[in-house]
């Protein structure tokens, strides 16, 4: 009797209905989980991107701790949450958290814009929405007439009170600048940041926060040991006499096949080149092209910073 009442279990329509209902339930559950986790994933991605950015600028060490430039070197630091400022630490500082990173970012990082003339401006000046403008990270920096720059302000009380418009108008409070870098590796797009000192020429550091390169080979562009090779390099190639023509000289950083010291010695070109990664020539070529193409629109701005800091004077950007 029971077997007769369940004869439909072997019917094609029942099997199809069962699969449909199961798929519908599973799909609904997955969609719900994705919806719930989406804000968390977005926050995690933003934290990682900002963390990598500040690592390039040396504000955060490779072991995820704040540091501050003092006495001619980078020293361990702690973020004072009450004063909202970095202070030199006499002991091992704690790990950077989401809260401390967000607070530092809000107080000491200004997202600005620059045009083809090297003029600085804020998003408010152009009545642009920051989130909307940055919502397409896959677009080239050359797709816009305005280009993004992240400005790191001096670690003091007066700087953190400055608005983006005030910083853009008189950028003497800027201690370092971070530029977005985008290019193509062996397997696809690569995205990163390049941090420069306020002279617009000397590299503080670099990072790559998104790529699809081969683990153990091209993926080593994210290796801190390799990234440290960029520190102190110059993005403007100096002439054989040591002089730099910011308006005309080659702008970028070259990742060469082999050793810089062996191939270039102490020539000016050595100051704008780093050792390549063994077995990742195509990725390294992509990194070289990424620097050249991404930095090109920023030449007027970098030249402005070079002139601004060589004169040591405070004057309006516009």
From Swiss-Prot:
Please name the GO terms that the record assigns under molecular function. Answer: FMN binding; oxidoreductase activity, acting on NAD(P)H, quinone or similar compound as acceptor
Give the EC number(s) under which this enzyme is classified.
7.2.1.1
Recorded GO cellular component terms are: plasma membrane
Residue positions where FMN phosphoryl threonine is found in the record: 281
SMART domains per the UniProt record, alphabetical = FMN_bind (SM00900)
Q: Where in the cell is it found?
A: Cell inner membrane
Cofactors per UniProt? FMN
User: In what way does this protein cross or attach to the membrane?
Assistant: Single-pass membrane protein
Keyword annotations for this protein, in alphabetical order, are: Cell inner membrane, Cell membrane, Flavoprotein, FMN, Ion transport, Membrane, NAD, Phosphoprotein, Sodium, Sodium transport, Translocase, Transmembrane, Transmembrane helix, Transport, Ubiquinone
Q: Which reaction does it catalyse?
A: a ubiquinone + n Na(+)(in) + NADH + H(+) = a ubiquinol + n Na(+)(out) + NAD(+)
**What GO biological process terms are annotated to this protein in UniProt?**
sodium ion transport
**What general EC class does the enzyme of this chain belong to?**
translocase
Q: Which Pfam families match?
A: FMN_bind
| Record field: transmembrane | 13-33
HAMAP family annotated for this entry? Answer: NqrC
Subunit-level organization: Composed of six subunits; NqrA, NqrB, NqrC, NqrD, NqrE and NqrF.
Similarity field: Belongs to the NqrC family.
PANTHER family named among the record's database cross-references:
NA(+)-TRANSLOCATING NADH-QUINONE REDUCTASE SUBUNIT C
Tell me the function of this protein. NQR complex catalyzes the reduction of ubiquinone-1 to ubiquinol by two successive reactions, coupled with the transport of Na(+) ions from the cytoplasm to the periplasm. NqrA to NqrE are probably involved in the second step, the conversion of ubisemiquinone to ubiquinol.
Q: What is this protein called?
A: Na(+)-translocating NADH-quinone reductase subunit C
Naturally occurring in which organism (per UniProt): Chlamydia muridarum (strain MoPn / Nigg)
């Amino acid at each position: 009797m029971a077997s007769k009442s369940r004869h439909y279990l072997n019917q094609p329509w029942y099997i199809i209905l069962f699969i449909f209902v199961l798929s519908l339930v599973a799909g609904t559950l997955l969609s719900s989980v994705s919806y719930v986790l989406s804000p968390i994933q977005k926050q995690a991605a933003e934290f990682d991107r900002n963390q990598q950015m500040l690592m390039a600028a040396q504000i955060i060490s490779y072991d995820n701790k704040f540091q501050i430039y003092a006495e001619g070197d980078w020293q361990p630091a702690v973020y004072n949450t009450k004063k909202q400022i970095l202070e030199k630490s006499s002991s091992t500082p704690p790990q950077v958290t989401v809260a401390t990173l967000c607070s530092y970012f809000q107080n000491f990082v200004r997202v600005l814009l620059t045009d083809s003339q090297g003029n600085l401006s804020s998003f408010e000046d152009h009545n642009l929405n920051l989130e909307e403008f940055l919502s397409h990270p896959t677009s080239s920096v050359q797709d816009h007439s305005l280009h993004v720059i992240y400005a790191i302000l001096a670690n003091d009380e007066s700087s953190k009170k400055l608005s983006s418009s005030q910083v853009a108008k008189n950028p003497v409070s800027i201690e370092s600048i971070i530029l977005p870098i985008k290019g193509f590796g062996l397997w696809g797009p690569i995205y990163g940041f390049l941090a420069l000192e306020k002279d617009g020429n000397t590299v503080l550091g670099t990072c790559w926060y998104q790529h699809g390169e081969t683990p153990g080979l091209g993926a080593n562009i994210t290796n801190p040991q390799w990234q440290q090779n960029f520190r102190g390099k110059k993005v403007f190639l100096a002439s054989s006499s040591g002089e730099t023509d910011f308006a005309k000289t080659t702008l970028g950083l070259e990742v060469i096949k082999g050793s810089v010291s062996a191939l270039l010695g102490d020539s000016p070109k050595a100051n704008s080149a780093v050792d390549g990664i063994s077995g990742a020539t195509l990725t390294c070529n992509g990194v070289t092209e990424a620097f050249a193409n991404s930095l090109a629109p920023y030449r007027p701005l970098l030249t402005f910073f070079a002139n601004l800091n060589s004169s040591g004077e405070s004057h309006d950007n516009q």
